From Swiss-Prot:
Residues 354-420 form the S4 RNA-binding domain. SMART domains: S4. It is found in: Cytoplasm. It comes from Mycolicibacterium paratuberculosis (strain ATCC BAA-968 / K-10). The keyword Transferase does not apply. This is Tyrosine--tRNA ligase. Catalyzes the attachment of tyrosine to tRNA(Tyr) in a two-step reaction: tyrosine is first activated by ATP to form Tyr-AMP and then transferred to the acceptor end of tRNA(Tyr). A motif ('KMSKS' region) lies at residues 229-233. One of its GO terms (molecular function) is ATP binding. InterPro entries: aa-tRNA-synth_I_CS, aa-tRNA-synth_Ic, Rossmann-like_a/b/a_fold, S4_RNA-bd, S4_RNA-bd_sf, SYY-like_C, Tyr-tRNA-ligase, Tyr-tRNA-ligase_bac-type.
Amino acid sequence: MSSGILDELGWRGLIAQSTDLDALAAEARPMTVYAGFDPTAPSLHAGHLVPLLALRRFQRAGHRPIVLAGGATGMIGDPRDVGERTLNEADTVAEWTERIRGQLERFVDFDESDTGAVVVNNLDWTRQLSAIEFLRDLGKHFSVNVMLDRDTVRRRLEGDGISYTEFSYMLLQANDYVELHRRYGCVLQIGGSDQWGNIIAGVRLVRQKLGATVHALTVPLVTAADGTKFGKSTGGGSLWLDPALTTPYAWYQYFFNTADADVIRYLRWFTFLSADELGELERATAERPQQRAAQRRLARELTVLVHGEAATEAVKHASRALFGQGELERLDAATLAAALRETSVAELKPGAPDGIVDLLVASGLSESRKAARRTLGEGGVSVNNVRIDREDWAPQPSDFLHGKWLVLRRGKRTIAGVEKL
């Protein structure tokens, strides 16, 4: 294969570990490459995008991607540091597999060409394995000593231990590589750097069972420069690709709020912008950080990628409207609700005090009634982008957007919502 894709992955900082890169570059073109994604939740999350987009980069470079949905491995679960996973019911895993399969199909191109993507489910071959075949045909090739040396396994053994179910996960993932090489001629597996041990086990198993040389490459796990966990939304949950779980507004705002120390790295990893474009954004961040040009570009690129152009424009319009630069009345109910729920929302029950002072305190925009009156006197309060300076102001039914929402703003940038119940 041409070394161009490896060069690109290199300058983007997307190669964490690999087998022999020179041997990989010498592979015939087009090469078949795969990455696997287990359905351990009803949706993929933002962290999955780096290996998933790596598949897309290989496809754009002239290679064929295989996207594997782990219908079998998702029923087992890769060992993790924090303890034994809860086993999900087979019907639940099957449902999640189909949902995730639909998400995976959005990121690579399917056609009849040599580079047309393939989506597979490892349950198709794993459920045919008998216990005897698993032990004789797979287990015989694995050293328990090597398996015990995995960092995660070692830490689990030092704690509450590990079940044989999770301990055997490596064998199932390794067998996926054997099946994909046998069925599709796959010669490269990519994944997150935490999967290196499992991927290398597959490389060895292909060599031992089929006498073939295949390759491995991992991408870095995404972390923030300040040590905080990447991909956690405002409420502390994961940043999901499913808009029913993480709204497009929350998705956009998460990436728009990326720190200067992280934004250029994220642009290299999550977008297809050229080195020249990235260089310009890096200079803009260094010289004019207050303009947040790189963050704006990152948020737009990723929101278009995951949610589409129309949803991205709706999010941008909502952001402008909330901060007084657009018409709140033009926002649809779903977009307005999603945007306000990313702020502090006060619930207004029937008969509850609804004066502006009460609303400012209830929404958290003011810490006390005295502070609320002071802010009103300074002209720093608006409701639905209309300045309010009277302490006796209270909303009329016609003030509630879509019959239930008020947008409160203190100063220029601090927003809260009121939801009429």
